[in-house]
Structures are given as C-alpha cells and as structure tokens.
C-alpha cells in the first residue's frame, strides 16, 4: 500500500491547490444518528467515518493542503481528524487543518457554505493557492480530483462544478444544472421542486455533487460581493452559483468512468440512503472498492484484535455471510447475514442479524432478532429483543423511517445514557 498516491499528470496543479472541506452541517435528516455528532463524523463501513472518504480522495489525488471547516457538535469530528490525519507533515507543505467557527469576522457563526469560506479568507490568503477546491464532507465516493483540476485549468473556467446523473425525482435535494454541448452551465437551480430533465434522458437530472474548483482570486471576489449583499443567504448553491452563470465561465465536470458511465457516489443524508450505502459494501463486487491498494481509505482505528467467530453447534454457529465484520468483533454462536458489524461489536448466541448496520461497540445479548435496522454506537440490545419484524411495536420504542421501514436504534431510546449533560 502506498503512503499516498501522487498523480503524475497534475502534480503542479495539486501542489498549488488548497482543499476546503465543509464539515459543519447538522445532518438533521439522519435524525438521532446526528444528535451527538456532526454528519461527517458518523461511522461508516465498519471502521471509517464519512469524512475519511473525501479526505482520502484529497491525499490520493496529490492534494495535501487541506482545511476542515467545522461547526455543529464537532467534538467527535475534531477528535477523529486529529487522530486519523496527524501523519501529514507541515514541514514539507502537507497539513489537515481544523477551522472551527470562531467569529473571525464578526459576532456571527457560519451562516452558510459561502459564509464559512468568507470567514476564513485571511487563512486562505496566507496559503497563496492558485486554486481552491471546495468539498462537502458528507458523501461516500472515490474520486481523483486532479482530473477535475486539469480540466478547470485547461478550459480557463472561473469555476468548475462536479456533477453526476441522478434519477430526476430524487434530484429535489440537489442543485440541478443544465449544460450546453461544451459543458458550460447555462442554468443552475438549488433544490428545485420540479427538476429539469437531461436532454434525451427524461428520467434523469444533472445534479451538483457539491464539489467546486475556483480560480482563487475569482473566489475571493465573489465571497466579498456575497458578504456585502444583504439579501444573500450566504450559500454557494442558492446565491453565488446562480448569480455568476450568465456573465462568467462556469463549467460542469461529469463524474464518470473511462467509458462515460456514472461512477459510484452516494449522498447518505437519510437513514435509508445511509443503510443502503452501507449494505452496498456487502455485495460480491461492490461499486465502491475498499480493497483498492492504489486508492486506500485512510482512517484511525484503535488497536484491536482480529474478528472472532466461535461455536459450531447446530443452531448455535458463529458465522457471517455476505457481510463486513470489523476488527475487535466477536460473533459468538450468532448468524450474521448481509450486514455490517463495526469495530468492537459483540453478538451473542442464538441471535440473527440480517440486512442491518451495527455501529462500533454494539453489544447484542442472546436470542435477539434484528433486521432492516441501524443500531447506533454503544447500544446494548437486551436479551430477547426483536427489531424490524413488527414496525408498529418498533415505533413505540425506536425511530422508524416511514418511507423505507428502516429502524434506527440509539442508546437514548434504550434508556442507556451515554451522554450525561447534568
């Protein structure tokens, strides 16, 4: 495995690029999963946090000047970044720098995505980048940003926006764009009620990935203009991008493979989308390859022993099928099917866990049945508990997402107070 991947075709560009990761969002659609943590800090894939994917993309793309802007309930996110990303060496121009909301400009906190950057203008200027790469910290994907940087520089664009095809009726939660034959953006609407369809693809819309490459001075100019506009909501998608479409070079960069097909990218903003993206990893050949040694996903994990599967009696056999089981787990006479069991989990005898996601340090006592569920970090599931079979009963105890029927269980719902405030 490489320490990092340095792209050969764009190293000058990547060295002159500052990446800023917007990681301050509340993630309210994830309900109680973000009650005590920011969305980018939510565990994912057995041993990672959501933010690890965008940070790994930066490092693997050769971009090693990175700022992480935090605000909402940021303690676990800050702690994770400090532990996982301290291998960057500032002496040779590498860093992952935490930029919490700290009222640098006035008495207000970050009011929106554009305001978060505006309040850190002095820090951006200090690093003297030629380009600023703005990223969301809450999506799951692998992407070589150097290709997008190269296209931006070659085209002479003022800003380039990463985009991907999505089902048209799912595009209401994204910025939706229209482009000409040269991928110049001709229209941009943030979260439209009736998204525009793509030409010749009536069931698809071209959605923003929340990835922007700005030429630095252009970005500074537009941030200042936006800050001076009393009618602005201080947001890139709602304010800055629509205002520059007509008079400036705003281009789209489709996120696709060598054959022109869309590549794996997931917005895990709801319980169902988080659950689906997690179980995607359990397929035989996942679209997101966690095992690619040329594109490793970096993270922090406490030193843990290997996963252990014990007992081989009929009806009490420790086994996992089509599942991910992370380090430190013990599957003790239990059956796991198409599920993710995260670090330090312990599933006791005579249990069945299927189509579920267990976050780190979950303990499932004997004779439990769990299906179609997300179990939050640190939960202890009492003996004999049944989750996911009777949604009416589950609604009385837990959160059930109405559209999907996925059940979310947290320690607070079980009466287990892990966060004592008084």
From Swiss-Prot:
SUPFAM superfamilies, A to Z: Nucleotide-diphospho-sugar transferases, Trimeric LpxA-like enzymes
Keywords assigned: ATP-binding, Carbohydrate metabolism, Glycogen biosynthesis, Glycogen metabolism, Nucleotide-binding, Nucleotidyltransferase, Transferase
Pathway in which this enzyme or protein is active: Glycan biosynthesis; glycogen biosynthesis
InterPro entries membership: ADP-Glc_PPase (IPR011831), ADP_Glu_pyroP_CS (IPR005836), GlgC_bac (IPR023049), GlmU/GlgC-like_hexapep (IPR056818), NTP_transferase_dom (IPR005835), Nucleotide-diphossugar_trans (IPR029044), Trimer_LpxA-like_sf (IPR011004)
CDD domains: ADP_Glucose_PP, LbH_G1P_AT_C
EC numbers for this chain: 2.7.7.27
Coiled-coil segments: none
Principal EC category: transferase
UniProt GO BP: glycogen biosynthetic process
UniProt KW Transferase keyword: yes
Residue positions binding alpha-D-glucose 1-phosphate: 110, 175, 190-191, 208
Gene Ontology molecular function: any one: glucose-1-phosphate adenylyltransferase activity
Superkingdom of this protein's organism: Bacteria
Catalyzed reactions per annotation: alpha-D-glucose 1-phosphate + ATP + H(+) = ADP-alpha-D-glucose + diphosphate
Function recorded in the entry: Involved in the biosynthesis of ADP-glucose, a building block required for the elongation reactions to produce glycogen. Catalyzes the reaction between ATP and alpha-D-glucose 1-phosphate (G1P) to produce pyrophosphate and ADP-Glc.
Family recorded in the similarity comment: Belongs to the bacterial/plant glucose-1-phosphate adenylyltransferase family.
Self-association state and partner proteins as the record states: Homotetramer.
Protein name: Glucose-1-phosphate adenylyltransferase
Organism annotation: Hydrogenovibrio crunogenus (strain DSM 25203 / XCL-2) (Thiomicrospira crunogena)
